[in-house]
Amino acid sequence: MKTFSPKPEHISHQWFLVDAHNKILGRLAAQIAHRLRGKHKPEFAPHIDNGDYIVVVNCEQIKVTGNKQEQKKYYRHSGYVGGLKETTLKTLLEKKPAEVLIHAVRGMLPKNRLGRAMLKKLKVYAGPEHQHIAQQPIPLSLPY
């Protein structure tokens, strides 16, 4: 019996809409990464990008457990000596709420060219409106 490898004509990408209102950040990111990779499909192959497009709205109302609002830190470097900058989750949620979810999902995807292509299929918006009405995304209710 030969191993099945999906061909381009077998691959279909659907659009899904996820509401992040009162969802927990890590659990939501894990489920989104699972769908972006295409692991929910029976024709999954690790070397092919057959995942779906995910549109996430209400990202500003995302929740975290414990004291992560004040204790979790995000680091970035300016490229100069002594240029390590740090921000807390609370300040990042106030300034750029979409970046919090993108950063969490990016850490759960492969760190290669395929992972970068999968991340481009994630569309995150802070408020309830999005600009992908023409794609007719299907509302997706995630279990937790």
From Swiss-Prot:
Could you confirm whether the keyword Ribonucleoprotein appears in this record? yes
Sorted alphabetically, the keyword list is:
Ribonucleoprotein, Ribosomal protein
Q: Which GO terms describe its biological process?
A: negative regulation of translation; translation
A GO molecular function term, named singly, is: mRNA binding
Question: What GO CC terms are in its UniProt record?
Answer: cytosolic large ribosomal subunit
Keyword Membrane listed: no
Q: How does it assemble?
A: Part of the 50S ribosomal subunit.
Homology family: Belongs to the universal ribosomal protein uL13 family.
Q: What does this protein do?
A: This protein is one of the early assembly proteins of the 50S ribosomal subunit, although it is not seen to bind rRNA by itself. It is important during the early stages of 50S assembly.
Which HAMAP family is this protein grouped with? Ribosomal_uL13 (MF_01366)
Instruction: Name the NCBIfam families on file.
Output: rplM_bact
Its recorded name reads Large ribosomal subunit protein uL13
Species this protein is from: Lawsonia intracellularis (strain PHE/MN1-00)
Q: What is the primary gene name for this protein? A: rplM
